[in-house]
């Protein structure tokens, strides 16, 4: 049967502050149609109805013949340019719901392209001498020792997609890591892609994605500003939001499709919000499942609502590493804003984290790239992708959090323990 549930805001907001409600982003429709688990093109539905001697709405049938429709190959999702001037999203979803009720075996999911809004907090600009010594989170994780131990085992460069506002590779901190990726479908991606306007102009005045990228890979030992987690990376910017922070779920689905097409190793997503489990997993889960099935490591922020993260997407999706935020203090504790619960896999520092250019940042947006960077270190050592999440979540520092519990046995990221395990157990690594 075809479901068309009303959904709360799907605000894929850069997670700096709690999100707020919004409306639909534009008039497009996101849908998935299958028959016996096989992909069905929405353009074929009128013919299927006709062949089965059922009436087909002529207005919708005519619209589908000429409509602009994007098909996301890896997930089977389609994005249809519906509009109130032609056929609306509600009309198309109603049409498909009726078709599914008439045609045995036809399954359809249909949703408007809900809006998202970025929200930011004031950053602490009280320091005018930005240097690596300000990165207390990195000091607490013993990153100097992590880099020393892991360096002799570095065997490969890791492709990391930053799904966010766009990146600016003129920034000397990330310029050396601009990636060039060949698409399996043909052609290539140089540095990134803008899914807001479907162009190769992916830079943004919005600095949210830039901060996340610096935490992953700001260049070490270049006498500039700060340092990132891993130096053996190629970055690609999958821009899903406008400069003002707005974006739609279709952008996220298209970006994940691209991540699969170019074969990245890690997707870092400092975005998300709550939605119904049925819509989260049935519709948008397909785009993410296509990536995790290929062995791509997907890391996502657990959210800033001081709430259970059970229906916070995409972090609640199966196979996605959900990351909560820790305060930089002893004893370890979750940040006051951080989401929590049995769907949270790991926590890392996310309150007052230095992200370059005299900026201290707080929110679950920032432990996410720290975990992504730790995953990149393991992959660069030749650790097999299927073991990375397990190594990270097994080698944590567990801490008491009775009021804000995590998944059983979850704890704080400890990259040093993780790297030592990868070194001590060569079977976890390939080619050694």
Question: Where would I find each of the regions flagged by the language model?
Answer:
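Protease zymogen maturation seam
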Residues: 73-76, 94-159, 167, 171-173, ...
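Extracellular S/T/G-rich loop segment that most often corresponds to the catalytic His/Ser-adjacent loop
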Residues: 164, 296, 312-383, 412
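Gly/Ser-rich catalytic serine loop of serine hydrolases
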Residues: 201-210, 303, 359-371
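Catalytic-core regions of hydrolytic enzymes
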Residues: 244-264, 274
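C-terminal subdomain of the subtilisin-like protease fold in secreted/lumenal serine endopeptidases
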Residues: 260-271, 277-278, 282, 287, ...
